[in-house]
């Protein structure tokens, strides 16, 4: 018998698949429905990590399964290949980003092929190529023409390490998302913005269309990020100048409790205040220089400056002080808020710190209940003029109406979502196709001159904007008047690249348009998208925005980009921390003894199971696993260890277990292959033995269980476990029933169905066995098995027989047999009869189709 030589087998089938180009996908196949499976495209860092392997294995299993279910499946792959790491490599190593990126792509493509993924490589894209980023520029122009792009001076998030602007979504706890120890600062720059806020309502309303296919957690994260708040915009009067100071509040019911007002240090009125009160200028400057993310953080102490100015409350005409405070941000609402310390926890703390008045205007509905401030529950209005006695819920409406009637303000809503700033002061991105001409002003490059190419004469020093160092790039000709012009030296945020890439896969060779509407409408929305939940408010929100814009531009028809979204769980691994060395050690440097680990010097290490990361030294190189166990074993372990949406704890013992299972199946097939090959599949169902029936029922139950597990919730681990149980049943059958031509037919029939069901998980292994069993072609093209309803359960049942509650035997009998026959059969069992000797039968209790309990006592 041949050994399971996985390296030889996997190489053989990868070469055959490639030679026959079996994964090539046509845009339409007669009689087949299109199905688009897509995993988020990777950044080409140079090496696959285990997270990649998990994501792409999930996608490949779905893709192969859907093909076998009769769909015309598109599963492409490409590279999100612009971005800072390539530029940083150029700075550190003197390697041009294009060379570094191309080399990394080649290695990662090789690794993906080693995993046996069924990608249509003819559709491969890479966002760093002019063939791709030309269309970023073309789409920029179309959005500009539609009024969805503008440029303005703006306070932006600036990473001192990246030397570039970050979107709000790229700032995490005040730190750069790429440099976790770098504080983001505020800087005022001219920036290009996409008007994503124009689509805020539609982005919220669109959740209704995708709610059945997307995780609720992702929809909630997007809803909170968009942050639509209903309230009232109220015009407070600045006493010193008579001008209006608009504020936005969701709690107009507390307007009578205002004891101060607050503005952000960046608010335009602050400049006027400083002219009148220059003594506070240094404090204001210090406040403005504080990290804006930190300023808005929950739990941080709030700091304020008394401006010396006052405002008049239009509702009760009270004069209250105007303060400047760091917790008020210009990028939300109007940059000014009212202070109601009796009914807001933050305001209460601020008022206490600066000894500001506290005025209660809502009390408990229970008149005898003593209220502790701040009181933030619903209640009854007090100290609120004509609104006294109303419930605070009713007052919210009545006071808003009153404010509108009097002309003091209006009911409106605000968003937390801000327009998407896309300008980046780096080289390795899509050049913005804008120019500045003294005569014509701001103009965009002509379509026929696209793409605006990245220049080669760049100095990668790590300081400032690299494109500013290229005169060849900056000096240009105005496309309108032919005069001298200067190119915009910013590049686009790389999230632009990934906001529409899934559409380019549909029509990747199109030279005239980013894609054909006719072709894209055949494939989109993407049927199944797979990626991490960390992309909820960046990539996934931007892609939804882009899709709606492209629909409105007439470039496609669907409203949403992704019908279903699967967010796979993180991959965890053991980490080993040395307090003595103050660092994480590699697993191979740790000495494992039972559930403890020690360093080479004998120090006991802190062992945790954590998300795999470079900083924790607990990552696993998938290629090492491929070399040791093979792609199929690695794929099987990944899919068996946990449901896809749950965390997966990497465990080499689990890999070894998956390998043992495959070798067991291998032996089972090869030990019986000659028998199976010589038998046809024509089973005589009228001549089935008890063992034949048992196996065929188990087979049909397994087909149903596997199909349901994949179709209903992608619980691939359940599907694999069901096949493992069936293999156990087959081994029992082989050891007891291989004594007829019928048995050989049933064995062959069952093994082939198992191999088909395992093939999405372990494709090389299964194609090899398929060939060994005398079958032609690729399993990729086989039809997924269907179960026979009539063979899901036996027409017989097993009855357990108890004597005084203890099991003494069992027998099989037709279901729903008459009770007299059941009792008679039970009493005849030899071991039961033995335990009835010398006993009187008191009564016999029969639970139909399950148990017979014979109650006895001594004679």
Curated annotation (Swiss-Prot):
CC terms in the record's Gene Ontology section: cytosol
Key words of the record: Aminoacyl-tRNA synthetase, ATP-binding, Cytoplasm, Ligase, Nucleotide-binding, Protein biosynthesis
Gene3D superfamilies with a match to the protein in the record: HUPs, Isoleucyl-tRNA Synthetase, Domain 1
GO biological process, one term: leucyl-tRNA aminoacylation
Domain of life according to the entry: Bacteria
Short motif 'HIGH' region, span: 42-52
Record localization: Cytoplasm
Record field: transmembrane: none
UniProt catalytic activity: tRNA(Leu) + L-leucine + ATP = L-leucyl-tRNA(Leu) + AMP + diphosphate
Residues noted as binding ATP in the record, renumbered to the chain: 614
Top EC class, one word: ligase
E.C. code: 6.1.1.4
Motif ('KMSKS' region): 611-615
Listed GO MF terms: aminoacyl-tRNA deacylase activity; ATP binding; leucine-tRNA ligase activity
Family: Belongs to the class-I aminoacyl-tRNA synthetase family.
Name used for this protein in its record: Leucine--tRNA ligase
